[in-house]
Amino acid sequence: MKKNILYLFILLTLGSYAQQQNITYSVSPNPFEENETITITIDGNSINEATWGITDNSLYIWSWSFDLNLQNIQDCPTNGMWTDSNETNKLTYNSGNDTYSISFTPNTFYSRTGIGRIGFLIKANDGSGDKKSQDITLDVGSFQVIQNTPQTNSTTIINAGEMLAINANNTGGNANYTLRANGVVLDSQSNISTYSYTHTNIIDNQNYELEVNLAGNIVTNVFNVIIDPGSNVGIMPTTYEDGITYIDDNTAILVLYATGKDFVYVAGSFNNWQPDTSYAMKKDVTRNNKFWIELTGLTPGQIETYQYWVVDKTAATNSPALVKTADPYSTLVLSPFDDPFIPSTSYPNLPSYPVGQEREVTVLQTGQSNYPWQVTNFQKPKKEDLIIYEVLVRDFDADRNFQDLIDKIDYFKNLNINAIQLMPVMEFEGNESWGYNTSYHMALDKFYGTEDKLKEFIDLCHQNDIAVILDVALNHAFGRSPMVRMWMNDSDNDGWGQPNSENPYLNEDARHSYNVGYDFDHSNPRTKDYVKRVIQHWVDNFKIDGFRWDLTKGFTQNCTANDEGCTNSYQADRVAILKEYADYSWSLDPTHYVIFEHLGGNQEEKEWADYRVNESEPKGIMLWGKMTTNYNQLTMGYNSNNDISGVGHDSRNFIAPRLIGYAESHDEERLMYKNLQFGQQSNPSHDVQDLNTALSRMSALGAVTLTVPGPKMIWHFGALGMENSIFTCNNGSVNTDSDAASGDCKLDTKPQPQWSNNWLADTNRNKIYNDWARINLLKTEEAVFEGNYSIDSGNLTPKIYIWDDTLLSSELKNVVILANFDVNSQNIIPNFPYTGIWYDLMDPTGTTSINITDTSTPINVVAGQFKMYGNKNSQTLSTNNYSLESKLTLFPNPTKNSFTINKAISKLEVYDVSGKLIKALSGDFKKGENFNIEDLSNGMYIIKTENKLGTTATTKLIKL
């Protein structure tokens, strides 16, 4: 079945396979040519639509095609996604005779010529849970070649010196037959209908082509013979690792764990993809029967590609004897499915996929240059201070690559976040995805860019004091993974399948109730070894600062797919396994961030959060703390279910701040979307369903989220009031999971209004950005925000108190936050901890204050706004304390023609020594921007700058 190679995110559950139905169909005309219109008709009596939850007769065809050699399988361009079929492929229902039909011309439908066979199945719009028919294939053309022995595209395993009998006939009568082996003509027979030939004394692997020519119509069948190399045992050095070990510029070692397999060949560009017995891998019986081979004579720096040909002479029922697969430890794979659609601007000079091969191949290259890291000793922000910005590279900007992030570094820097968390960037199936359908966990997905480009982004972040966290999906793998395919059930013999009972890495059936893809068995030492290699690869080679572990509920072996209660209960094996992975991460980097998306019971989460937290280098695992519903109730203006105390670690009784509280994430509906759809409208002058009104309430959201001690997270463009629904479709429409139309657009690529409409220049959106930037800076720079807190919430006027009694009275040691999410102004009793002067911490000048003589005197807060008071000015952020000479630097200075500034600014003014304004510039000036002053006379000038927060600074400039 073809669904395993597609651009999708499939939900598989234990009971899902029962939903497949075998249909009855007819094709007219039959046989048919590729340029002839055909009609496929499905008997409605053979389908129980209700089994798939279909009530409106919405069925779809999912189709693919083969070339004339019955290879080079390509999906129909209009398939859509497995979870959301394209309407072009919808079948027409004929109620009169209860049939479904679709008509098309193969050349047009598949956008190709030279079609030898087509395949199709019928499915629901969302095919999740195997809501599909059986796979059906149809030969194209009235002239067909029937190969009796061996079968087309088959592989026959023989011993050296044995023979192979080849028999075939055709549907057109007498024809000319030509048999080639490894490109050399072996036999020719003319003007015959039935062909027979025996190839004797075969001593090398053979790639056969049987060409049949009938009056210029040519069909070529391909098949193979692989020689069993017999006993080939060898002990390898203990320094050789799974995957590639580079010895020198001319030598590489390949190691493959393939338990239960009889022998393995390595086929690649270095042997023209025709390996002889010298490329049979040795088996090391002292290291779990791992296979290994030494490749010598490689050209330094030359790109080579390879696959493993893995053979099991006594394969389990429905499992293939031969699997051709890339290396499971690949760091770069080439894909015939995805690579043709990768823009050269994202991945320049992408190596070409080798002609004539199928499925992924691994790239090998000796003599690679090390990346020239600028920052080699990055000091991570403390866990308590983290402001994490979650990013999906695909939806961040129009080019959908790492360069987009690099180009927008000032956007991150000026927001004053100190960590960026990338949704999965490991090699996933397809190009446009959330990334959780990973197949090669050590390989970078090329759609986003090159390895060096990701390293450049990480290095740039570190230069700007920003940590980089990777989201990893290590609870599962998808169908292209070698760890799936080497031990799989492939009942329809299409090269794809599910893990079988012999699979050492993956469970045959999922052992938890939230499974996607195929479920890893983390109790198996081989799986643990693989996971640890993945961790080591990204930490050592990419200087990744931490991992966010997706769906940690899946790391148990104790449950079943339909037992949600078990999955959500405390599981000791899951706790221990994930502690082991955390320990390994900390062994590589004691300050490594370990983050779990568990969203489960507090017993497990507390055990992880408190784990090793009191060491001299504090550890402790950070947990995602979802608070979307409660915060959205506030932003919409509803006085129910709005207790936000769960955003802080005290609510979970954690020893230390290890809860990453958030109001939005990639997996939840946008707060602004719901504000506009369902917001409170009881006050016409403050209608939350009005865009600008809804935006005006989002600064207060930041005030009651980001300030709470402990790590916090922002979902991308929340700081600009992004209102596009999570269910926004490619075309900008919205189709949710509850809409009448089947399917939803949750996983669709999203539009980019934040840049195309220049939201940073929008006053209402820019205010959110600047307010959150100010809050983030307070959070990360002021010690009090690592102190204690209390939250008074459960109404529309939440109050937050933050304090640190260890700080001096001359320091900022108490913070009081008052917010009003009502649609009317409210007088809020502040309950200040003591009387005296309290300063407005949102005023960068430090000049706004109130004199509190009674701590209970109400303070008026207008609808949707907030107040943040401190007992002292922010000593680190006040404009009055903004060091002129040390903070603002011009280079070169003195200068003759131009200078650059070490800060991102929005305004620059040049004054002469008398105070006269000579020159003024406004704009979004990046750090390092060049300013030309050739028009100025020689002498001394005063340069005054202002950034987006309104902070100003001045310094001297000498013009030569």
Predicted region positions:
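C-terminal outer-membrane/trafficking sorting elements
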Residues: 7, 881-960
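Aromatic-rich carbohydrate-binding modules that target alpha-glucans
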Residues: 58-111, 248, 255-303, 311-339
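Solvent-exposed segments in extracellular or luminal domains encompassing
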Residues: 191-207, 930-932
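Basic K/R-rich, polyanion-interacting modules in nucleoproteins and related proteins
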Residues: 226-264, 323-384
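Substrate-binding/active-site clefts of carbohydrate-active enzymes
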Residues: 328-330, 368-544, 551-570, 580-589, ...
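Conserved alpha/beta catalytic core and glycan-binding cleft of carbohydrate-active enzymes
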Residues: 543, 576-723, 727, 780, ...
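Residue-level detector of functionally pivotal "anchor" positions at catalytic/ligand-binding pockets or at interdomain
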Residues: 688, 788-790, 794, 871-891
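C-terminal beta-strand-rich structural cap/linker in extracellular carbohydrate-active enzymes
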Residues: 853-876, 939
